[in-house]
């Protein structure tokens, strides 16, 4: 059942230079649709950041929050209809002035709609990738489905997308890293799990790898393989393969895997070079990678919301890519004998041995 509740956004005075009215208006309701229950930590953190910033800026519109309660990828056939039901409810009563989608599944369900309310109502998104896949028809076998990757910046001109904060995954920069460290690499093994996020990331990687016909792409796909099967495949990968880790939370058994399973995958082939496109495996398995700088985007979305609905100019922020950066595990680099390789400028280094002063900065000097 769809989880729904109302939040009345009360205006509070925080030292603004002009007097503010402590009131709530129902004119132009803001509708926020989340992929998961709002009590889920990632959703809750972003909603809290949104509410705090919106109130701080002086926003006073009624905010309605709906949850799609999405679970496993196997139920993806249901998401489009769930989204349609939510939108139809508001289309019959009072259409919102803005729709905000939080989460990959909610966003995919929204851009899979053909209704007027979906295409005409101003929309924003957060906690999503710049690259996505449109949900399939009911007859499609999701295990075998090979969708095309869509780009939010190019492929949805018929939707009224006024803003959003999106993660951009960069295959090119990670391939360049692999070649810098392993110039004899001939194959790339990409790991993705049995989630919508894993599937959309796999579709994007397949699209990008067409630029590199000289490299063979191997898919370690959680939709078709269990954790043990993926582990066994990793065990037998040859020395001309580099691994690119995408996502790894759920395998084909639809059971959530424990966080320490990536340690098991590492130990299945300890000399296998591994890179990460989404920070999974950093700190114990991956050598490094170019990844988005993940953070709560609720504050930024609130700012864009206020500027669009309540600002003097009604400005559109547009879709904003969340910055990315290079991250490397110094300890892993040393274990693989890669200390002497020049790293990209500005790279973040983790597991770095602290210097003498840093180790003993809290010690009290003794004067003899």
Residue ranges and their predicted role:
Residues 20-368:
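Short hydrophobic alpha-helices and adjacent helix-cap/hinge residues
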Residues 5-13:
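Sec-dependent N-terminal signal peptides
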Residues 15-17:
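N-terminal signal peptide c-region/cleavage motif recognized by signal peptidases
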Residues 1-2:
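N-terminal secretory signal peptides that target proteins for export/translocation
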Residues 9, 19-20:
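Cleavable N-terminal signal peptides
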